[in-house]
Amino acid sequence: EKLNEEKLPGCYLHRTAVNDVARVEDRTFICCERKEDAGPTNNWMAPAEMYAKLRKLYAGSMRGRTMYVIPYSMGVVGSPFAKYGIELTDSIYVVLNMAIMTRAGQKVVPYLDEQFIKGLHARANLDPEGRDIVQFPEDNVIMSINSGYGGNVLQGKKCFALRIATCLGRDEGWMAEHMLILGIQNPQGEIRYVTAAFPSACGKTNLAMLIPPEGYQKNGWKCWCVGDDIACIRVGEDGRLWAV
């Protein structure tokens, strides 16, 4: 819904369904051949069984709607640390937010190879009983349906950068962690970066978005957010930890 052009130029209102306002842990699955590989705290279903279930849910779910194709990069495009994906969706809300939260667009296409993450999302009819958020780490596939909530459908975030990336990191020798990254500069110009892990709803974003009090700013202190939720951490050639 377009808002008043004079008061809020270029702004639109997107209304969230009242039954679709949070991530759904009980409907979030890791589907791999061996149940033990999904981890002790995750929901599991055999891939063949889940694919069969999802095919029925997706059948006709985008009929009459526009399908958008979003090529995106988690990290600087062209960086050796970047990971790439494509999300197909029928939601303009997803398109606009993926453009904010990832590096998306034509510039990503030349970097897509056989390792890119394949994602499919459909709002369908927002039926909670058919709402599934599914990761297939052995296939590099993400599928989510019957939701329009960001945590369930912006697949570059929790689905890719945390769940799928945990498996990629295990195989490639790095870590995907539920952590913020904060940059701090003192009055002498020395810069330090901090990563911090808090449970959900305990202040990761608040700390990551920290603005120094006015008195500290006048004395030359600066803070900036590198990331407020997920950190991909590697050991550099210098033996130190580096995070994006």
Predicted regions and their residues:
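Hydrophobic positions on the alpha1 helix immediately C-terminal to the Walker A/P-loop
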Residues: 207
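Conserved internal helical-beta-strand scaffold that buttresses enzyme catalytic cores
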Residues: 1-202, 212-234, 239-244
